[in-house]
Design a protein with these regions (language model features):
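Positions that flank functional sites
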Residues: 92, 154, 181, 240, ...
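A short secondary-structure junction signal
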Residues: 148-150, 189-191, 245, 343-345
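Conserved AMP-binding loop of ANL adenylate-forming enzymes
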Residues: 163-199, 208-211
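Nucleotide 5′-phosphate-binding alpha/beta core
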Residues: 1-137, 144-159, 163-175, 227-234, ...
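Conformational gate/switch positions in structured elements
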Residues: 142-144, 173, 289, 351
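Short, flexible, solvent-exposed loop/turn segments with mixed acidic/basic and small polar residues
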Residues: 136-137, 197-198, 251
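Active-site glycine/GP-rich loop and adjacent strand/helix microenvironment
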Residues: 1-60, 68, 75, 200-373
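Short, well-ordered, mixed-charge alpha-helical segments that flank or form enzyme active sites
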Residues: 156-158, 184-190, 242-243, 268, ...
């Protein structure tokens, strides 16, 4: 059976209604997800519990822990990664000083995509054949793409971060989510069931594939959303903004989901306002990149506090650069989780500002990316 069988729209409609909706959510969260986690030899739920414990701590304590983690990460990189062993060893860098003097971090040279491409395996702490790993290629929206290798622990942390952030936005694992993806001409229709289908069931997730944002394409998207009725929708803001404009023109307003999670490109204020008003949903923003995963999120559920930087996942900086317009600063990150390929002071290519407040670090004035279909 192929995934375009005519029975599936009916099954989608059925799974979006009670009591099937609740039964499916409970089965996904408490049966399918643990089974999938065990089959894939992942350890996500334990790391999710760690994140909940971490963010219950006062910010001053979290900041102290982040500084210790920063020093530990740099020390590990100097000991295990050939590139850092040579680069930082040549300047006599002492990572222990970071525990008491965070300004000393400025002595570490910035890491760029060019350096990652040039150095290759010299940025790895061990050969890829020695441990499970996940290869991720950057999209190239902020320069030429490069390859990042994640170890198992880092991949599990990245998955746990997404679950934690969505929980803060009001979405539990029992509630369904929908992801937007492009459909290209000539793409074959996949068979059903597949490994991806079980993965989606375990995560209580479905995908929606679209090829165009014309009136017919937007009508198809809206009809699918009405059938499935997900709690959270994840996609590019430009796509959902186009949908909001179409619904406003044809219906005035409409509601098919509770939360829109913006990702992949910069969401402008006018887009956020239109989406919230027309589609009658809460809008949450997040910032992430292939090199590091999700690094900032509207942890207050999109209620106005802004994107909070995840101090558990890395050290964040914003630095003035000569080529940045209007005094913007470039975002620079040091990753804490990925011991296979630790990135120290990595230049993201994105512009924004790191702002310290009483309750955390926040990402403001972001100038991001735009994706065209």
């Amino acid at each position: 059976m192929n995934a375009d069988h005519p029975i599936f729209p009916y099954l989608e409609w059925l799974s979006g209604r009670q009591p099937v909706r609740t039964l499916k959510g409970l089965t996904s969260a408490y049966l399918a997800y643990p089974v999938a986690e065990r089959m894939e030899q992942r350890q996500v739920r334990g790391k999710l519990a760690e994140l909940h414990r971490h963010y219950r701590k006062p910010f001053a304590e979290r900041l102290r822990l982040a500084r210790q983690q920063l020093a530990d990460t740099v020390a590990f990189a100097m000991q295990a990664v050939p590139y850092y062993k040579d680069t930082l060893g040549s300047i006599g860098f002492d990572p222990e000083r970071l525990r008491t003097d965070i300004g000393y971090l400025q002595d570490i040279p910035l890491l760029t995509k060019d350096i990652i491409r040039e150095q290759g395996d010299r940025l790895l702490s061990r050969p890829l054949a020695e441990a499970p790993h996940f290869t991720c290629k950057t999209g190239g929206s902020t320069g030429l793409s490069c390859v990042i290798e994640y170890d198992q622990i880092a991949a599990d942390h990245a998955a746990a971060v997404v679950l934690y952030c969505r929980k803060m936005a009001g979405k539990s694992q029992r509630q369904s989510e929908l992801h937007f993806a492009c459909r290209f001409p000539g793409d074959p229709v996949p068979p059903w069931p597949s490994r991806e289908d079980f993965k989606c069931f375990a995560m209580n997730r479905s995908n929606i594939f679209f090829g165009a944002l014309d009136a017919a394409g937007l009508d198809e998207i809206w009809a699918t959303l009405q059938r499935r009725r997900p709690y959270l929708v994840h996609g590019h803001p430009s796509t959902i903004y186009a949908l909001a404009c179409h619904i406003e023109k044809t219906q005035g307003k409409g509601k098919a989901f509770a939360v829109f999670e913006s990702s992949g490109e910069l969401m402008e204020d006018y887009q956020r306002k239109k989406i919230a008003e027309v589609l009658q949903c809460r809008v949450v923003n997040r910032y992430g990149l292939a090199e590091l995963g999700v690094m900032a999120y509207d942890l207050d559920g999109g209620r106005g506090q802004g994107m909070q930087l995840l101090d558990s996942e890395g050290w964040s900086e914003s630095l003035a650069t000569d080529n940045a317009p209007d005094g913007h600063q470039e975002l620079v990150f040091t990753s804490f989780r990925n011991r296979l390929m630790p990135l120290l002071r990595y230049r993201s290519g994105d512009l924004g500002r790191v702002e310290q407040r009483e309750n955390g670090l926040f990402l403001t004035d972001v100038v991001g990316r735009l994706h065209d279909i």
